[in-house]
Amino acid sequence: MRKERQNNTKNIKEKKNYKKAPLMPIHLRVFMAVVLGQIACGFALGISGTALSNASKYITINDLWTGLIGAGSLIGLAGSILIGRLSDKIGRRKLLMLNMYILGILSLMQLLTNNLPTLFIIRVLIGLMIAVDYTVGNALLTEWLPKGEDSKKQSHLLIYWTIGFIASYLTGTFINGFGSHTWQIILATGAIPAFIAAIFRSIFPLPASPSWLASHGKVKTANKVIKKHMGRKWGIPKRLKKAKPVKEVSWTILFSGKYLRRTLVGGLFYACQAFAFFGISIFLPILLQSMQLTDQKISGIIYNGGMLIGVILGILLFNRISRRAFLISNFLLSGILIGFLAITKNLNSNIQLTIFCIFAIILSSGLVLDYPYPTELFDIKVRGTGVGTCITISRFGAAAGTFLLPILTNQGGASLSMLICAIVLLAAFIICLIWAPETSPKFKQNN
C-alpha cells in the first residue's frame, strides 16, 4: 500500500507544467470565447457615438448629455477595480459565463427609453459588463494559454476588439429609415454580438483557471481541471504546488513600495491613451464635421481603416521591440502629429485627412499593449486586482476624453479638442520615459 502511494506521488511529481504544453483544443476554445467577447465589447463601446449623432436630429440633447451618455459605458468600465477583486476572490469562470447575456439584455433595453438619465444608467451598466471581459477575460486567457502564446494571443485580441469597434461605426453610419427610433435601434444592435458570445460560452463552457485554483490552495481541483481538458501528463507547476494559499488582497498593496511604480505606470499610460483614443473615435462624426472635411462619411471610414492598419502594425512590432520603447515612441509620435494638426491653420483637406489617418495608425498601434502590458506588470497574487485597478484608472481618462470632446469642439472647434489630446499624449510620453519598466521576457534578458 505504501509503495503504491509512493508511485502515485512520483507520478504527480512527474506531471509536466501545463503552461509548457503545445496549443490544444482547450486553448483555442478559451481564446475564441474571449475573442467573441472582445468583438462585443468593441461594438458596445463604439456604437454610442453614431447613435447620439443621429439622435440629435430627433430629440433635444445638449453637449452635457451627449458627453455623459457617450462616456457612460466608459464610466461603467471604471468598475474594473471591483470586478478584478471579485475575480481574485471567486474565480474567473462564473463572471464570464454570465456577463455577455446581461450585456445583450441591457443593449435591448435601450429600445425602450429615450429618457436621457435612464439611458445614461443603462450605458454605465453596459460598461460594467464590458469590464468583466476586459479584466477577467484577460486573466483567464493568460492563465490558460502556454507560456509565450499568452502575451502573443493577448496582443492579437486588439484586432478583434477593433473589428467590433469599426463594425459599430459602419452599423451606425448605414442604418437609417426608422425615423425617430433610428438612434435607439442603432444602440440596440450591440445585443447581437453580445448574445453570439454568450451562446458560444454556453455551448462550449469555459473552464476554471488552474493557476487561480492552485493559488487558493486547491491544487487537487486544479489538476483535475487540467487532466479533464489536457490529459494525464500535464499538471500544476511545482512553484504553485508549494505556494501558500493567497490571502485576500488589499487594494493598498498596489500602492506599496513593491507595486506603486507599476500601478501608476499601468494606470496613467492607459488613461492618457484612452483619453485621446476614445474621445476622438467615439465622437468622430462631430470632430469630422468641425474639421470641415468634404465627405465626412468616407473620411470616417478612412480613419477607422487607419485604426485597423495600426493594430495590425502594432502586432507586427509587438515582439520585435521592447515594451518600453514601444510606449515611449508611440506617445511621442502621436502627440506630435495631433498637435501639428491642432496648431496648423488652413491646411488642404486631403493633407489634413492624411495626417489624421497617420495619427490613427500610430495611436492605434499602441493599443496592442493595453492587454499584455498591465497583465505583465503584476504577479498572479494581485493580477486581477492590479489589472482591474489599471483599467479603472484608464477609464477615468477615457470617460474624461469622451465627455469633454463634444464640449471642447463646440466651444473651440476641432483645433481645441486636438490640442488637448496632444498635451495628454505628450504627458504620457514623459511619464513612460521616466517610469515605464521593461516587461518583455525577450528584452529583459538582454538588459
Show which residues each predicted segment covers.
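Transmembrane-helix signature of 12-pass secondary carriers
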Residues: 2-447
